[in-house]
């Protein structure tokens, strides 16, 4: 869910092994080609039931939303598969979804975020998905420019979920522990410390459920990797 604590506040292979096709490429990388990196962490597969549900929804729900995801990808330069994976993690691709905290639509936009992204009808898949894509791009632009993909994309997705302020807190904690605050694997390992008073008491934005955000990004990466098997429109083959 975007902007859970205010507006200050992206496979089954290892996270970051391949940036989803079409995601914004780092400097020096040809646009549209995947940026690759060594797997920063080793993680478990999707739970069997979740993987089964996801594959079923690729057949039943994704076709109704694919055009909005592809249009948002053209607008932002972020790969449609990554956007679709993010949307699935947020709402299970349900345009009428509403969270207990008031986030709405496919990309689970909070009302103030939707307004800032120019969304007038939050339950319109076209508007909501475009708004979510623009918000992710906004988060990516707020991640320090020196950080290259794929780390920058995963950090931006974490910020989409937890807010840029809490992400910066997690990066500071990572640095305190003499790890690399520009490397997603290191930040991911330290995100859970935002719920530990020994650490969040030393941060600007305080408590946050960082473990939830770490899993959020992991799920997005897993869904995006599975979506790599979905062919482009008009493509032949499996």
Where are these predicted regions, by residue range?
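Catalytic glycan-binding domains that act on GlcNAc-containing polysaccharides
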Residues: 34-238
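Signal peptide processing junction and immediate N-terminal pro/mature segment
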Residues: 21-33
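N-terminal secretory signal peptides and thylakoid transit peptides that target proteins
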Residues: 1-14
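Hydrophobic h-region of N-terminal signal peptides that target proteins for export
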Residues: 14-20
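Catalytic-site microenvironment of enzymes
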Residues: 5-6, 26, 47
């Amino acid at each position: 869910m975007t902007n859970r604590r205010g507006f200050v506040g992206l496979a089954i292979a290892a996270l970051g092994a391949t940036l989803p096709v079409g995601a914004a490429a780092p400097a020096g990388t040809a646009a549209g080609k995947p940026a690759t990196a060594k797997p920063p962490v080793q993680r478990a597969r999707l739970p069997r039931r979740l993987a089964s549900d996801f594959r079923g929804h690729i057949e039943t729900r994704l076709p109704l939303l694919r055009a909005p995801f592809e249009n948002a990808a053209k607008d932002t330069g972020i790969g449609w598969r990554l956007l679709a994976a993010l949307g699935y993690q947020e709402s299970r691709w349900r345009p009428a979804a509403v969270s207990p905290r008031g986030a709405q639509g496919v990309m689970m936009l909070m009302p103030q975020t939707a307004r800032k992204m120019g969304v007038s009808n939050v339950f319109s898949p076209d508007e909501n998905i475009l708004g979510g894509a623009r918000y992710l791009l906004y988060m990516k632009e707020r991640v320090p420019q020196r950080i290259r993909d794929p780390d920058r994309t995963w950090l931006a997705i974490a910020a989409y979920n937890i807010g840029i302020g809490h992400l910066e807190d997690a990066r500071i904690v990572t640095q305190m522990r003499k790890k690399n605050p520009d490397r997603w694997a290191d930040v991911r390992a330290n995100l859970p410390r935002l719920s530990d008073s020994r650490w969040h008491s030393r941060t600007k934005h305080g408590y946050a459920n960082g473990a939830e955000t770490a899993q959020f990004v992991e799920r997005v990466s897993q869904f995006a990797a599975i979506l790599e098997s979905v062919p482009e429109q008009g493509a032949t083959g499996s």
